[in-house]
């Protein structure tokens, strides 16, 4: 009998493959996206120093509405772009975290682009 692979395990393998090819620096950090059933998270990471420069999530105080829909992802994209601008970061490397570029991940990326991040 053929056993079906766990979706999350497949995503993690895909993410590891992508991560072997991309990394962030202080000048051009990695914009990492993590999606859960209840929330969405974004971080700007300097992989050379191993430091998170800026982060945003739908769990933060002051965030209203559902935490894990397309509208929430758009708000997080705007927030991460504004916080990056405060730290004088304009260019990033996008890391979709092994997720398909669709739905919440796409909404976050497009909102970040519209608010000044280049990738």
Curated annotation (Swiss-Prot):
Designated name of the protein: Large ribosomal subunit protein uL18
The protein's assembly and partners: Part of the 50S ribosomal subunit; part of the 5S rRNA/L5/L18/L25 subcomplex. Contacts the 5S and 23S rRNAs.
Q: Which CDD domains match?
A: Ribosomal_L18_L5e
Choose one Gene Ontology CC annotation of this protein and give it: cytosolic large ribosomal subunit
Kindly give the Pfam families that the UniProt entry links to this protein: Ribosomal_L18p
- Got any disulfides in this one, which pairs? none
GO BP: translation
Sorted alphabetically, which keywords does the UniProt record give? Ribonucleoprotein, Ribosomal protein, RNA-binding, rRNA-binding
Which portions of the sequence form the region Disordered? 1-24
Q: What does this protein do?
A: This is one of the proteins that bind and probably mediate the attachment of the 5S RNA into the large ribosomal subunit, where it forms part of the central protuberance.
UniProt xrefs under InterPro entries: Ribosomal_uL18_bac-type, Ribosomal_uL18_bac/euk
Quote the gene name from the UniProt entry.
Answer: rplR
Gene Ontology MF terms: 5S rRNA binding; structural constituent of ribosome
Q: Where is the composition biased (Basic residues)?
A: 10-20
Instruction: Tell me the protein family, please.
Output: Belongs to the universal ribosomal protein uL18 family.
